[in-house]
C-alpha cells in the first residue's frame, strides 16, 4: 500500500463548521490566592490560534493543499483576528458575520504547560438564521474537491442536511466530524468520523471489535454512508466499509501530550488524502499517523509535510553516496519535503581532476543537495571509444562520493540521462560547457516542473582527454 505525499498539494478542500478562536494565557504560578484556594498566575505571554473548524482548515493548509473555510462569526475584533491569521496561512475565508453573536472564543490559562482553567465566550447559534452561511458555501463549492463538515455542536451547522445535499448534488465527497446523539442528520454524507464515546452514545456499548464492527455496519447502512471511521484513542481506529472486512489500525502515538484538536487533524488529513486521489484504507492510514504525531504537541497544533514524510519513511531514508535510481527518487522527494533545494548534473567523470572538483563545488553552491548521474561503462565506451573508460563505474562512483560537494551518485546506461532526470526532477539541472539550456538533456522536463537549467563554465586547460593524451605522450 503506497502513500504518495507529493500529490497532497494538488488537493482543494472546503471546511464548513463551528469556527473558534483558541486563546492561551501563559504564566508562572508560585502561590495560592489569599482570596480563595486557587493558584495565582502571573501572565507573561498571550497566544491566539484558530480553533474548531478553523484548526481543520489550518491543518490542511500546513500540509501544502488549498483550504477554504466557511463559518459563522461575530462582527467583532476576534473575527478580524481569525480572518487575518487564516489568510496569512493561505486559508481562504468565507465568513458569515452575524450581529447576533460573538465569535466563539476559548481562553485557556496555562502554567508550566498545564491547563489550569478554561473560560468560554460564546452564545448558542442554534436559533440564528444561517442562510448566509449556506450562500457562502455555495459560492465556495466550485473550487473544492472535498467538503469537510466540522461539527462542534455550537449551531453553525443547524442546516447540515441542506449542506450535505448541496455538496453531494454538486458531486463533492462530504466528510463529517459529528457531534451529539443524533447522527440521522448526517444521512447521505460520504463518511463520518465519531470517536468511540460518540459512537457508543448512539449505538450502545461495544465491548469488543466484533460488536463494534457489527453495530458500525448497521449504522453505516442506515445512514447511507460510503464508510464509517471510529477513532478509539489508545486502541487506534476502525474503518467500516460496505463489502469489506473492518480495518483496525493501532495507534501511532508514542507520547500523548495534549489531545486538543486531534480530531481536527484526523478529519483534515483524511479529507486531504481522499481529495488527492487516495482510497479509504490509504487515507485512514495517513490520518492515523498524523493523529499520533499531533497529540505529542501542546494545544491546537498542525503538522508539516516534512514531519509526516519523516514519520512515514523515516526508517527508509537513503544514505548519502552511491545509490540506486528508485532509492534516489525517494531521497530527493524527502529532501524537497524538508525544504532542501536539489541540484543535479551528469557526466562520465572517468579520471577525476581539479576541473571536475571546481565544477561540482560550483554546482553544489546552487542548492542544498547535489546529485551526480554517471555514465555506466558501456555508455562511456559508446561516447568516448572502445578504450574508455579508464576507471570502471564502481571506482568512478566511489571517488565522486568521496567529494564533500556530492551527496548522491547514481549510474545510468542510456545515451543521455533525459529519462533519469525526468524521474528525479531536481530543482536545478546543471551542465558544463557551451550548451544552450534548451538543448540540455532532461532540461525540458525540469523546466516544465518549475525548475531551472543552468550552464556552468569548465576550468580552462583541464580535461580528462587532455590528461590521457599527456600520459600517453610521456610513455611514448
Swiss-Prot record:
Annotated GO MF terms: ATP binding; heptose 7-phosphate kinase activity; heptose-1-phosphate adenylyltransferase activity; phosphotransferase activity, alcohol group as acceptor
Tagged with keyword Transferase: yes
Keyword Protein transport among UniProt keywords: no
Pfam family, one: PfkB
Record-stated family: In the N-terminal section; belongs to the carbohydrate kinase PfkB family.
Gene that encodes it: hldE
Catalytic activity: D-glycero-beta-D-manno-heptose 7-phosphate + ATP = D-glycero-beta-D-manno-heptose 1,7-bisphosphate + ADP + H(+); D-glycero-beta-D-manno-heptose 1-phosphate + ATP + H(+) = ADP-D-glycero-beta-D-manno-heptose + diphosphate
InterPro entries referenced in this protein's UniProt entry, alphabetically: Bifunc_HldE, Carboh/pur_kinase_PfkB_CS, Cyt_trans-like, PfkB_dom, RfaE_dom_I, RfaE_dom_II, Ribokinase-like, Rossmann-like_a/b/a_fold
Protein name, per record: Bifunctional protein HldE
